[in-house]
């Protein structure tokens, strides 16, 4: 077992409905890691990518209330240009997007609540300068959110 792939763990989205909403040339990734340790591992993986091919990093994050949101976000301090927080609609324990934005801000990140992943992608696309390197976008914070994203994108796990 030298190579194992887990759907929803640093999974690249190369095509689909949500990918089409992002700024042209964007890299979209999903990761369902939802605790501070997972945040560190994902941040390290993104730092390696950044060394090879630099791109501005944006997070689109939704989390549930049983997780340590602030310390999850701390792993991305100094890396993420901005965080869009979204509701997790498939769990009753989803943290309201406004509250999650406050947790990201506590961790030192620029953050704003939006209503959906699609809204975040459209907002980013509408404000993106064509002269800038296309962004790397990580959709993260909850396996529930990853499931929603894969379904909405039209790329459910095999």
Question: Language-model segments: which ranges?
Answer:
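Nucleotide phosphate-binding/pyrophosphate-handling subdomain across enzymes
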Residues: 1-82
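Short, flexible loop segments at boundaries between secondary-structure elements
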Residues: 8, 88-91, 158
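Surface-exposed, flexible loop/turn segments at secondary-structure boundaries
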Residues: 18, 65-67, 91, 119, ...
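C-terminal helical cap/extension that packs against the catalytic core
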Residues: 25-30, 36, 73-135
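Active-site catalytic pocket residues across diverse enzymes, especially alpha/beta-hydrolases
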Residues: 46, 50, 104, 128, ...
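Cofactor-binding loop segments of dinucleotide-utilizing enzymes, especially the Rossmann-like FAD-
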Residues: 61-65, 88, 141
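Canonical bilayer-spanning transmembrane alpha-helix
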Residues: 136-140
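Glycine/aspartate-rich loop-and-adjacent alpha/beta segment that forms the canonical ThDP
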Residues: 142-158
């Amino acid at each position: 077992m030298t190579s194992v792939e887990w759907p929803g763990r640093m999974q690249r989205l190369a095509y689909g409905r949500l990918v089409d909403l992002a700024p042209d040339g964007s890299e979209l990734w999903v990761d369902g890691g939802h605790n501070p340790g997972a945040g560190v591992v994902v941040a390290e993986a993104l730092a390696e990518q950044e060394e090879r091919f630099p791109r501005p990093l944006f997070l689109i994050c939704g989390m549930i209330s049983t997780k340590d949101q602030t310390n999850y976000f701390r792993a991305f301090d100094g890396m993420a240009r901005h965080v869009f927080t979204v509701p997790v609609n498939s769990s009753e324990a989803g943290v309201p997007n406004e509250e999650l934005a406050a947790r990201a801000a506590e961790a030192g990140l620029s953050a704003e609540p939006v209503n959906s992943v699609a809204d975040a992608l459209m907002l980013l696309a509408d404000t993106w300068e064509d002269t800038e390197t296309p962004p790397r976008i990580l959709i993260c914070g909850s396996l529930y959110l990853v499931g929603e994203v894969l379904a909405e994108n039209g790329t459910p796990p095999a």
